[in-house]
Amino acid sequence: MTSNILLLLHPTVVTDQHIVENIKLKISNTHKDFHLSQTTIDRLTQGSIEFDNNSFDEIIYINPNEEQYREIPNSLMKLIFDLLKLNGKFTGDLPTDQNLDVLMNGFLIINQNEWNKPQPEETVVTLKKKSTTTNNNSNTSTIKKSFPMFKKLNNDNASTPGLTDSSAGTSEDETATVSNKRKLVESKLVYFSDDDDDDDYDGSSDGEDLINENDLIAESNKYKIIVPKKCELPNGKKRKKACKDCTCGLKELEEEEIKSQGKLQDTVLANMAQSATIEAIKIEERMKKNKIKFTEEDLSEIDFTVAGKTGGCGSCSLGDAFRCDGCPFLGLPPFKPGEVVRID
């Protein structure tokens, strides 16, 4: 049977021209009847070349890089899984630090250089046994399991607890529980009890056993409600700053005001920075347009002793009070143009 084999090449294979030739030679020695295809990772992932799913018995990955640089993306791993047939193999230069991704994509790790696409196992569903029927004289009867019957407690027998088994006696704990329930009913606190047992209440009790909610509200009005004091001074003026334990809401108002001021300042600074950037760009553009060009006469050395020749500031011969910081005549007395000045 012909085996379909795919050579999946990493782009760095071009660094060694003998790698692919050696792999093909090994394949020809180990396989008698095979059909070999070859492509690169980038062409496969970009869709430049397409293969049918479940079309390859083996995919060989060639990556000459070191182990820490052999990572395979999940998208490529899933694509390789789809191209392999059932029980197909993915071999070659595989990464060793992606075991979780390999298992999540459906592969089984056989060894360090081989992953396998397993064949799914058939699931076995256990069917429920149907109810048996007996036929007697064309009369069909279905055998059904009977459930135990329980006796419901009546209001007349509320003083004694109802038992499902007449042979069981009444324990001390059950007696105490029944007496506590009876006390709750007498004190009209059943409405507030969190007992989920509906045996004692079957919906037939009168409304007198329940407490009216309006009565509870009326009773709560008797208690004095604590109202927080306003942050006001004795003279009637309002406080400029909230107290340490403020409860009137002034502290929250101050915090909101501080936040609004901060946002306003951030907006102003951002606008200023933006305008400064725009102005700097305009200045730079103007400087590029107005280029300063010096002639040969401007670039030649200036002799301050010759009449008509002056420095850039034109004040070198007037004295130190008029000379620049880097003037070579600093410290010398004033001189006239044409006068010989020597600097020792």
Swiss-Prot record:
The entry's [2Fe-2S] cluster-binding residues are 231, 243, 246, 248
List, separated by semicolons, the cofactors it needs.
[2Fe-2S] cluster; [4Fe-4S] cluster
Regarding protein family, the annotation reads: Belongs to the anamorsin family.
Residue numbers spanned by region Disordered: 154-179
Residues spanned by motif Cx2C motif 2: 324-327
Q: Where in the cell is it found?
A: Cytoplasm; Mitochondrion intermembrane space
What is this protein for, i.e. what is its function? Answer: Component of the cytosolic iron-sulfur (Fe-S) protein assembly (CIA) machinery required for the maturation of extramitochondrial Fe-S proteins. Part of an electron transfer chain functioning in an early step of cytosolic Fe-S biogenesis, facilitating the de novo assembly of a [4Fe-4S] cluster on the scaffold complex CFD1-NBP35. Electrons are transferred to DRE2 from NADPH via the FAD- and FMN-containing protein TAH18.
User: GO cellular component terms?
Assistant: cytosolic [4Fe-4S] assembly targeting complex; mitochondrial intermembrane space
For the region Fe-S binding site A, give the residue spans.
Answer: 231-248
Any GO BP = negative regulation of nitric oxide biosynthetic process
Question: Organism classification, top ranks?
Answer: Eukaryota, Fungi, Dikarya, Ascomycota, Saccharomycotina
Q: What is this protein called?
A: Fe-S cluster assembly protein DRE2
Q: Where is the composition biased (Polar residues)?
A: 155-170
Q: Is the keyword Lipoprotein in the record?
A: no
Q: Where is this region: Fe-S binding site B?
A: 313-327
Q: How does it assemble?
A: Monomer. Interacts with TAH18. Interacts with MIA40.
Where on this chain is Cx2C motif 1 (motif)?
Answer: 313-316
Q: Which residues form a coiled coil?
A: none
Q: Per the record's keyword annotation, is Mitochondrion included, yes or no? A: yes
Segments for region (Linker): 161-223
For domains, the record's comment is: The C-terminal domain binds 2 Fe-S clusters but is otherwise mostly in an intrinsically disordered conformation.
Q: Name one GO molecular function term.
A: metal ion binding
**What's a Pfam family in this record?**
CIAPIN1
Identify the gene encoding this protein.
Answer: DRE2
Q: Which residues bind [4Fe-4S] cluster?
A: 313, 316, 324, 327
